[in-house]
């Protein structure tokens, strides 16, 4: 990535560095700005347009330089709406890239892409700011320790465990529960690990952003009485905002997370919902800048843009950033260039299945499609590894038998296969779990299940200890003891009906 000479020398007065230009052309969110000869801004510099529109309303639009065109002109992308701008308006070169507030004062607050608070709680009490464009940490600074990050979600911890300081992708089409799973992870991690999180809402629904904020206040993740005790900072650049804002909001969130890692030396969680919208915004900006599109209409710089963001999300010897990224899969096609490029950067993938969601099994995590580089005996231990492999083998055999069952029925299967199917159906249901953040919808209190409990439960099902219990006893419960209690209740209810 290019570095800006102006950012490395804070002693130079920014006032001296400010150059004045004029708007020469406006095409939607893209501005061409003419500067005096020899006063051209650098790539990624922030430009600010101030003035009044025809109705006398104040205008304050920040842009980012993307191209130097020649003839003393630059092309910049606006971070907010360009309504009211006119040719000839003055444009100030700030001499630096966009800088956003960082540190403890950001916790409990909502920011836009420019680092401005948008929660009506007044200014942010910090003088510390950081530019959103930086190089990734040097190779020698990186930390390579391998350890599991327990989430309290059975299907994740058992079959596709997350790496502390790793990158995890949540893959799924529209409406299969990506955002609910992210909200549950924020809730569990804040309560169980006491970690600090940064949430980047990239191009998603404003309503979901508002719901998330309200639920965080209710659950105590954001402490309204004492914001300093909050566990999360929120950065939103939602669907209705210009592509420039959606393209850069991920970097704003990442910059805040980097400060907690590098200066406060903390372990941080960075949530990005949705990384596909980052690619989509980049595609829009690329088209507006006149670049030739690549495969499926995406920008030719897709891999570079993704790599620039992802390589900064890493663990150093000071602290770690564990990143969980929702990845919208267009038309459920995993070979689309956007999800395919994202795959290359991930340590674990949690794939959400429409088939499981249709069955009512939530979280709708596909146990066979989800993967993790952490599921190795030397990392997770022999017992965990063996249990996970047996669960996968049982579910795989059930999947193979489904066609035979659909055509001939269960009675045509061998005794051994019928037992496999019965256990697989119990496992499938036991992989479901009531969520804390979904209590209002399900009416069931949320459950956090430790890894040891999860392994014990699945071992008991695989050993045949619960072959006599009905499969509905395993649906939406926490640990295995709750399943046995539910089976007893179901038996009593059926006796009463008789």
UniProtKB/Swiss-Prot annotation:
One of its GO terms (molecular function) is proton-transporting ATP synthase activity, rotational mechanism. The keyword Membrane applies. SUPFAM superfamilies: C-terminal domain of alpha and beta subunits of F1 ATP synthase, N-terminal domain of alpha and beta subunits of F1 ATP synthase, P-loop containing nucleoside triphosphate hydrolases. It is a peripheral membrane protein. It comes from the Eukaryota. The modification Phosphothreonine is found at residue 6. Coiled coil: none annotated. Its main location: plastid. The modification Phosphoserine is found at residue 13. Its EC number is 7.1.2.2. It is found in: Plastid, Chloroplast thylakoid membrane. Keywords: ATP synthesis, ATP-binding, CF(1), Chloroplast, Hydrogen ion transport, Ion transport, Membrane, Nucleotide-binding, Phosphoprotein, Plastid, Thylakoid, Translocase, Transport. One of its GO terms (cellular component) is thylakoid. It is an enzyme of class 7 (translocase). Transmembrane segments: none annotated. One of its GO terms (biological process) is response to cold. ATP binds at residues 172-179. PROSITE patterns: ATPASE_ALPHA_BETA. InterPro entries: AAA+_ATPase, ATP-synt_VA_C, ATP_synth_F1_bsu, ATPase_a/bsu_AS, ATPase_alpha/beta_chains, ATPase_F1/V1/A1_a/bsu_N, ATPase_F1/V1/A1_a/bsu_N_sf, ATPase_F1/V1/A1_a/bsu_nucl-bd. It catalyses: ATP + H2O + 4 H(+)(in) = ADP + phosphate + 5 H(+)(out). Gene3D superfamilies: 2.40.10.170, Bovine Mitochondrial F1-atpase, Atp Synthase Beta Chain, Chain D, domain 3 (1.10.1140.10), P-loop containing nucleotide triphosphate hydrolases (3.40.50.300). F-type ATPases have 2 components, CF(1) - the catalytic core - and CF(0) - the membrane proton channel. CF(1) has five subunits: alpha(3), beta(3), gamma(1), delta(1), epsilon(1). CF(0) has four main subunits: a(1), b(1), b'(1) and c(9-12). Interacts with RBCX1. Produces ATP from ADP in the presence of a proton gradient across the membrane. The catalytic sites are hosted primarily by the beta subunits. Belongs to the ATPase alpha/beta chains family. This is ATP synthase subunit beta, chloroplastic. The lineage of its organism: Eukaryota, Viridiplantae, Streptophyta, Embryophyta, Tracheophyta. The gene is atpB.
């Amino acid at each position: 990535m290019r570095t800006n000479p102006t950012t490395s020398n804070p002693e130079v007065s920014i006032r001296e560095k400010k150059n004045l230009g004029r708007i020469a052309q406006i095409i939607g969110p893209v501005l061409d700005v003419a500067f005096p000869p020899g006063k051209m801004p650098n790539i990624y510099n922030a430009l600010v347009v101030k003035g009044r529109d025809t109705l006398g309303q104040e205008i304050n639009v920040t842009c980012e330089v993307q191209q130097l065109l020649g003839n003393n002109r630059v092309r910049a992308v606006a971070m907010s709406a360009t309504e009211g701008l006119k040719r000839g308006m003055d444009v100030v070169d700030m001499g630096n890239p966009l800088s956003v507030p960082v540190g403890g004062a950001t916790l409990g607050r909502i920011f836009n892409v420019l680092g401005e608070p948008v929660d009506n709680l007044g200014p942010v009490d910090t003088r510390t700011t950081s530019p959103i464009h930086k190089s990734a940490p040097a190779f020698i600074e990186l930390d390579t320790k391998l350890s599991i990050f327990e989430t309290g979600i059975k299907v994740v911890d058992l079959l596709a465990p997350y790496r502390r300081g790793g990158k995890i992708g949540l893959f799924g089409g529209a409406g299969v529960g990506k955002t609910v799973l992210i909200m549950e992870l924020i809730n569990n991690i804040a309560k169980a690990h006491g970690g600090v999180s940064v949430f980047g809402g990239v191009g998603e629904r404003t309503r979901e952003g508002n719901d998330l904020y309200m639920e965080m206040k209710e659950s105590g993740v954001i402490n309204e009485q004492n914001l300093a005790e909050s566990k999360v900072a929120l950065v939103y650049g939602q669907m209705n905002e210009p592509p420039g804002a959606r393209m850069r909001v991920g970097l704003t969130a990442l910059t805040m997370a980097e400060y907690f890692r590098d200066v406060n030396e903390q372990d941080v969680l960075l949530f990005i919902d949705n990384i596909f919208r980052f690619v989509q915004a980049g595609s829009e900006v690329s088209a507006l800048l006149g670049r030739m599109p690549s495969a499926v209409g995406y920008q030719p710089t897709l891999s570079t843009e993704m790599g620039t963001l992802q390589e900064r999300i890493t663990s150093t010897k000071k602290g770690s950033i564990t990143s969980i990224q929702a990845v919208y899969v267009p038309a459920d096609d995993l070979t689309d260039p956007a999800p395919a490029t994202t795959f290359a950067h991930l340590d674990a993938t949690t794939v959400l299945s429409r088939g499981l969601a249709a069955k009512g099994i939530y979280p709708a995590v596909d146990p066979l499609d989800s993967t993790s580089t952490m599921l190795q005996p030397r990392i997770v231990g022999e017992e965990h590894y063996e249990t996970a492999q047996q669960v996968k083998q049982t579910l795989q055999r059930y999947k193979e038998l489904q066609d035979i069952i659909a055509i001939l029925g269960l009675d045509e299967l061998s005794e051994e296969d019928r037992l496999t199917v019965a256990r697989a159906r119990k496992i499938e249901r036991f992989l479901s779990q009531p969520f804390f953040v979904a209590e209002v919808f399900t009416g069931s209190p949320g459950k956090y299940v430790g890894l040891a409990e999860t392994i014990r439960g699945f071992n008991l099902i695989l050993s045949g200890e619960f072959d006599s219990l009905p499969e509905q006893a395993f649906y939406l419960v926490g640990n295995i003891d709750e399943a046995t209690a539910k089976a007893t209740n179901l038996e009593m209810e059926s006796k009463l009906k008789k």
